[in-house]
Design a protein with these regions (language model features):
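Active-site mouth of glycoside hydrolases
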Residues: 1-241, 246-252, 257-271
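Active-site-adjacent "gating/activation" loops or surface patches in catalytic cores
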Residues: 268-272, 276-277, 281-285
């Protein structure tokens, strides 16, 4: 059984991720998502123990629907919200919070089994995050005003990547020019952090390698943004995997589970095995 979205906040919206009103695992009423609700943790532990008694193995998810709120000590004002994608793979504070949750949920000793999840043979795998990627949604992800600092962070990282690869704007311009057409805009300069990434949708965006060279989705810009995304994915997953091993996790570790496109596939190669979401005949109530 996959223990999924245990980190979700209490929600009223139909079809939304939400936890038990009386006993959520994380006690968001304290103004942050960093502490367990005592009854919620007890229910979680009891459920794990009963599954184990029946010979049912456990798939442990880490971040799924975590509600990042101002009380978590975020880098920027306001609440980032629940189920956000991509930004928790870039932002240092969000990564720290993910590691904190991983340590607390995996190293806590279950009073019903006498074991922490890191030592329990009923656990067969730990998954780092749910349906996420550093290139998911590209530069147009989450247009809420309060998320602008997080979008800026991605753009700044991309520009730093371009400077590291090319050194100067002139060399970048040369690399992005084909048959007299340049994909780099006159106003774009990596030293000023103004080079835009690729526009796209929920998955890795598509690109025609023979398409128009000078547009935002040009093959040159696309290739560098995908290389950047692969690098960010692998850096994040390698770091998280090293941290989980330092806690004592012994089972195979999965990176994520909604991989679409060759760049995304390569960006998730650091998992011990692969997962991908496939939904069949799902009822929505």
């Amino acid at each position: 059984i996959r223990l999924h979205a245990a980190d979700a906040p209490i929600g009223e919206e139909p079809r939304s991720w939400s936890s038990c009103k009386e006993a959520p695992l994380l006690d968001y009423e304290k103004g942050n998502g960093r502490e367990f609700h005592l009854e919620g943790l007890d229910r979680f532990d009891y459920f794990v123990a009963k599954l184990k008694e029946r010979g049912i193995y456990l798939h442990i998810d880490l971040i799924v629907a975590r509600d990042f709120v101002e009380g978590d000590g975020l880098d920027y004002p306001g609440n980032a919200g629940s189920c956000i994608k991509r930004f928790p793979m870039y932002n240092k504070r969000m990564i720290e919070l993910q590691k904190e949750y991983a340590r607390k949920i995996l190293c806590h000793v279950n009073p019903y089994t006498g074991l922490a999840l890191i030592d329990d043979p009923a656990v067969i795998t730990v998954q780092i995050n749910n349906e996420d990627s550093a290139i998911k949604g590209t530069m147009d992800t989450d247009q809420r005003e309060e998320m602008q600092p997080y979008r800026d962070e991605v753009q700044n990282r991309f520009n730093s990547f371009l400077l590291m690869k090319y050194g100067t704007r002139e060399r970048l311009k040369e690399a992005w020019t084909f048959e007299g057409k340049c994909a780099l805009g006159e106003e774009e300069d990596p030293e000023k952090g103004t080079v835009q990434g690729t526009a796209g949708n929920f998955y890795q965006p598509e690109c025609d390698p023979l398409g128009k060279w000078e547009e935002n989705e040009s093959p040159a810009r696309y290739a560098d943004f995908m290389e950047f995304g692969i690098t960010m994915n692998r850096n994040f997953y390698q770091d998280m995997k090293d941290y989980l091993h330092s806690l004592g996790v012994k089972v195979p570790i999965v990176t994520s589970n909604l991989v679409a496109g060759a760049a995304d596939v390569y960006g998730h190669t650091d998992g011990d095995f692969r997962e991908n979401s496939i939904f069949f005949n799902v009822r929505l109530v």
